[in-house]
Amino acid sequence: MELWRQLNQAGLVPPGLGPPPQALREVSPVEIPGQTLRTAGADTGGACDSLLWIREELGNLRRVDVQLLGQLCSLGLEMGALREELVTILEEEEESSKEEEEDQEPQRKQEEEHLEACPAPHPPDFEMMI
């Protein structure tokens, strides 16, 4: 499974998750050329046909499992690439916000100086009794 290997090398395999089952990593016995189902003796009431059907269905299920595993691995690799892209975007936004803060610093200082020049509101110097 090349995609699984790529996923593992990218560090995207969840911790504790081992390799795929051996049945998905090896060539299916159904796919081995020259391999046939042999029975000793006479056909016992269609048992051979049933076994062939079961074997064929198991092979179909295995193919579907391999396809699904491949799709999951592809999806994992794509998610890893998107995660890296997101990290890059967030870093760029952080840098631009720092630059904006640095650009706004002189303006803030001017506003503070202006506020210091204006006297703060305070209560009147006289008292009134009723």
Swiss-Prot record:
Q: Where is this region: Disordered?
A: 91-130
Compositional bias (Basic and acidic residues)? 105-116
**Bias kind Acidic residues: ranges:** 91-104
- Which Pfam family, any one of them, does this sequence belong to? DUF4530
| Superkingdom of the source species | Eukaryota
Show the coiled coil region(s): none
Q: What InterPro entries does UniProt report for this protein, alphabetically?
A: DUF4530 (IPR029202)
Record's PANTHER family? GLUTAMATE-RICH PROTEIN 4 (PTHR36879:SF1)
Report what the protein is called: Glutamate-rich protein 4
Which species is this UniProt entry from?
Homo sapiens
- State the taxonomy lineage: Eukaryota, Metazoa, Chordata, Craniata, Vertebrata
